[in-house]
Amino acid sequence: MPDVPETVGTPDGSTEFEHRPTTDQSFENALAKARNGTRLTVDDAVELFTTGTDRDGIDHDRKEQVLEAADRRRAEVVGDEVTFVANLNNNVTTACNTGCLFCNFKDRSEQFRSDYQEDHGGFTKTPSESRQIVQDALDRGIYEVCSVSGLHPALALDTEHREILETSDRGDLNYRSPDEYETDPATYCEQLDAMNVGDIHLHSMTPEEAYHARRGTDWSYEEVFSRLQDAGLDSVPGTAAEILVDEVRDVICPGKIRTDEWLEAMAAAASVGLDMTSTMMYGHVENEYHRALHLQRIRDLQDRTGAITEFVPLSFVHEETPLYERGMVDGGATVDEDELMIAVSRLFLDNVDHIQASWVKYGDTQGLKMLTCGADDFMGTILSEEITKRAGGDYGEFRSFQEYADMITAIGRTPVERSTDYEQRRVIDPDADVLGPQLGPRADGTPLLD
């Protein structure tokens, strides 16, 4: 893994990147191919993202043509259902020193050491705390727990891995003994085992975390994911992808694994029988050609594995990130770019049935609009530890089944509760007196929150 620089030069995607959004293709030809279902090329995707490289800026009429084509494709592939899952987010720790410039989630790992004197807003949970959080949410009716965390230096795959790290004399492993920290995060396997309660679906361990879980060893990703699977892992979130083009990763996340290693880890997860999701975090320093290359790499991975259940475009939220604070970006993607991202993803990824609209990223109004641009999934309830506390408080990002039913039916679509892998589905009656989950292991239709 490369060292994280203190500063990174500000690239102008139109002048300094090797990959530029220029093609020998025409917008009209790309749109025609999209409409008739011909597999698109990278150049086709660039033309659709830009609404024509022969134009300066996004052409509104052309954009609407792309959105219409994507919405028709969505209807052909998945119909008028809009799915969502009853889920919980339980992130183990915010401690991380990877230094990604787009991130405002992490806290410097040294702040968590037992000799650190100043207050900080981060957290690390013990396995027993994670288990209690999941147990409470399971009793409320959730189907899935999603857990994605910072790369805490004390985290190891299991006790064998910890012993290897403890005895290693290498100084490049990003490892410190848990004895040095106020709270011991235990191991990845211990955390997963703790969260593996009552047949809940456990969605965790990104490729970046899998790398962290094998550092200092010659273990394959297959070995790592097999051990995680034995601890209870059911599926893998395809986050940490950001943009799968190394010249972009060199700018926004130079401390993260490279594109090839991300793809290797995902293929390994699929090879041991784990389903996975896929993502793209866009709207920062990258250009349309990078976005198209990213989509091609996701599509190629799906051609090889068939294990990707959904694609999730994640619009960059720039506030309070180093990219923004250092003047490397002046904002995120525009609304037009967001809509075209959903649409082109639908048209390009002909082997991924489900495209998700993130209401957390887009907001409710624009999130619903994305469901007319090619998306068919509307995330999940995102119950969290803070929400499960009985005594008041801010419910934050939680979304109830009643809210889902009201919003989805308002745009003329059918609300459907789903499982993580989309194999289990339940059409929801928006006129029912009480709306709650029924697919979770302990769900009985009671609302998640009273």
From Swiss-Prot:
Encoding gene (name): cofH
Family: Belongs to the radical SAM superfamily. CofH family.
Cofactor binding description: Binds 1 [4Fe-4S] cluster. The cluster is coordinated with 3 cysteines and an exchangeable S-adenosyl-L-methionine.
Chain intervals for the UniProt region annotation (Disordered): 1-24, 430-450
Protein name (record): 5-amino-6-(D-ribitylamino)uracil--L-tyrosine 4-hydroxyphenyl transferase
Classification via NCBIfam families: CofH family radical SAM protein, PRK07360.1
Keyword DNA-binding: no
Primary role: Catalyzes the radical-mediated synthesis of 5-amino-5-(4-hydroxybenzyl)-6-(D-ribitylimino)-5,6-dihydrouracil from 5-amino-6-(D-ribitylamino)uracil and L-tyrosine.
Coiled coil: none
Ranges for domain Radical SAM core: 82-350
HAMAP family hit by this protein: FO_synth_sub2
PROSITE patterns assigned to the protein according to its UniProt record, in alphabetical order: RADICAL_SAM
